[in-house]
Amino acid sequence: FGIEGKKEWGSDWPLRPCLELADYTDAEKTNPVTSIYAALGRLKAECPELSWGEFKELTLTTQSYAYARVLDGKAVVAVYNNGDSPVSMEFQLPVEASGVEDLLADCVGSQPILTQVEWGKLKVQLPSNYATLLRLVG
């Protein structure tokens, strides 16, 4: 649930507080951590390429990273910006596509990203310290 904890001498109980689940009934709609975990769980069930797809590295720099999981002509691309400033990425598509769908766009705290598919390449603009999953479509 994104609860901060503090390790104390002789005990780690503060790291694992007792929770009343009734206090978190709307956490998926209000808590960014719970929202993303719930979405990732759903996507693992809905997108077999995430579990069974071949791993393909698409780009790697000191600040950004993109890789795909590809299965039966379908692909999901994970894009990461570990830097403190926005980043533009461009890389070859692992499968033919005419567009992308941001699979985490509905999560609490998600930010808009710009994407463009052109000439077999994907261009992505990511905010600082941000990541998402993109399904290639078309």
Residue spans of the language-model regions?
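C-terminal beta-strand-rich structural cap/linker in extracellular carbohydrate-active enzymes
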Residues: 115-138
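Loop/helix patches that line or flank the sugar-binding groove of alpha-linked glycan CAZymes
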Residues: 1-97
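Short secondary-structure boundary/capping segments
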Residues: 57, 68, 114, 123-124
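A residue-level signal for conserved active-site and pocket-lining positions in enzyme catalytic cores
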Residues: 40, 100, 129
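Solvent-exposed beta-strand/loop surfaces of large extracellular or lumenal domains
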Residues: 101-121
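Short C-terminal domain-edge/linker segments immediately following a structured domain
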Residues: 25-30, 107-112, 134
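Conserved active-site loop/cleft motifs that coordinate metal ions or position small ligands
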Residues: 77-80, 102, 135
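Short, flexible beta-strand-to-coil junctions
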Residues: 70-72, 107, 137-138
